[in-house]
């Protein structure tokens, strides 16, 4: 869990030269906000011909771009599966796993997240994973479930490319990390970070969710002030908080409520605020969050869903008891990352395989340890 660091940092002279601009996608229906027509992105808008894609919108089923609002609940960043020998994508298991999660009752799926080993995939492989997931859901009768797609990159240009490819492959929303390679040149509170998200949102064909995960971006931890400011963009619709800061979560929820009135449990909130780890599911809900987007739900979707249900029904003591089991199981996943998660899935579900190299294969002792670490959680999951 990353430290709770929610204080804004002063922007350096390098970042102070940047200005914000909004330029909606043509035909998107996005409202214009105050913009600077001299934006560094305004003179050469990207166009579809600049990118090649394995999938075009004309090859998709009509269900692939139906409206799928984001509603409160449990979202799962799905694991990506590979052939154990060749490390090629195992599309059969990718599709089967997506349907298993849908049948468990999750609210939506995410491809190309940390659990999906996005950093190990090529552009075309990312599209294959997303398209396989969307097609499997549609074929199994779950065409209503939204698919979020990790689209973060180090430049505005490539991030927009990922967003367009995600849309072409059937994705509904883009989950975006802030750029981090040149993090010393700008701070989490700087104009350049704001400019990055706004520039991507202006040209993305799908709405964005901000992904605040300091551990993956050189420690960059976006403040609640920055996230609240970005929430005003019509094409930025939510945030995933893997920082674990429930105080930040509470501030964002309070500032983005429509008319400061709580939204219906079944309605799409004006700005979706999700906890980024299952070990603080209940804490996120108590703080006003709308649910979680958590990797542990690959193993225990029903347990995560049950915590949400118990909380909504006012059965706090029961929810707390279940949260304790989930938190202990999540600690095993946190300690071993995707390696332990896949090992646990292999041990208890009969599939999971290995992460792509250079991540190591677990030793027999490690596999046994992680199997034991998930034992209590799996027993709970099977009881539901």
Each language-model region and where it sits:
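C-terminal alpha-helical cap/extension of soluble enzyme domains
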Residues: 2-6, 14, 18-31, 41-43, ...
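Active-site beta->alpha loop and helix N-cap motifs at the rims of alpha/beta catalytic domains
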Residues: 21-24, 36, 56-219
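Short, amphipathic alpha-helical "lid/cap" segments that border enzyme active or binding sites
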Residues: 91, 95-98, 224, 367-375
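A general structural signal for well-ordered alpha-helical segments in protein cores
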Residues: 94, 126, 130, 159, ...
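Alpha-helical structural signal in soluble globular domains
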Residues: 104, 128, 132-140, 165, ...
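Short secondary-structure transition/capping segments
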Residues: 121-124, 186-189, 221-223, 251-252, ...
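Catalytic alpha/beta core domains of metabolic enzymes, predominantly
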Residues: 199-203, 214-334
């Amino acid at each position: 869990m990353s430290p709770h660091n929610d204080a804004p940092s002063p922007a350096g002279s390098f970042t102070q030269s940047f200005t914000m601009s909004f330029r909606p996608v043509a035909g998107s229906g996005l409202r214009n906000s105050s913009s600077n027509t001299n934006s560094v992105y305004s003179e050469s808008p990207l166009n579809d011909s600049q990118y090649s894609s394995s999938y075009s919108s004309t090859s998709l089923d009509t269900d692939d771009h139906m409206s799928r609002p984001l509603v409160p609940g449990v979202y799962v960043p799905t694991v990506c599966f590979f052939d154990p020998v060749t490390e090629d994508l195992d599309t059969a298991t990718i599709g089967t796993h997506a349907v298993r999660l849908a049948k468990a009752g999750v609210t939506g799926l995410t491809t190309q997240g940390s659990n999906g080993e996005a950093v190990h995939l090529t552009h075309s492989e990312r599209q294959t994973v997303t398209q396989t997931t969307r097609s499997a859901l549609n074929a199994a009768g779950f065409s209503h479930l939204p698919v979020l797609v990790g689209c973060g990159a180090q430049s505005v240009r490539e991030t927009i490319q990922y967003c367009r490819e995600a849309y072409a492959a059937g994705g509904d929303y883009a989950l975006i990390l802030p750029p981090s390679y040149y993090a010393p040149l700008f701070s989490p509170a700087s104009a350049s970070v704001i400019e990055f998200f706004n520039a991507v949102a202006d040209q993305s064909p799908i709405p964005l969710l901000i992904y605040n995960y300091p551990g993956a971006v050189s420690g960059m931890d976006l403040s609640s002030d920055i996230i609240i400011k970005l929430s005003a963009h019509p094409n930025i619709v939510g945030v995933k908080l893997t920082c674990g800061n429930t105080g930040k979560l509470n501030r964002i929820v309070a500032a983005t409520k429509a008319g400061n009135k709580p939204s219906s449990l079944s309605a799409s909130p004006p700005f979706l605020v999700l906890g980024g780890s299952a070990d603080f599911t209940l804490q996120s809900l108590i703080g006003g969050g709308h649910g979680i987007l958590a990797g542990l739900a690959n193993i225990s979707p029903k347990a995560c869903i049950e915590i949400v249900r118990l909380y909504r029904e006012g059965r706090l003591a029961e929810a707390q008891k279940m949260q304790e089991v989930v938190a202990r199981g999540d600690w095993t996943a946190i300690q071993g990352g995707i390696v332990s998660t896949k090992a646990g899935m292999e041990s208890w579900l009969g599939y999971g395989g290995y992460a792509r190299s250079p991540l190591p294969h677990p030793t027999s002792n490690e596999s046994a340890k992680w199997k034991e670490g998930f034992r209590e959680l799996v027993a709970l999951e099977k009881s539901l």
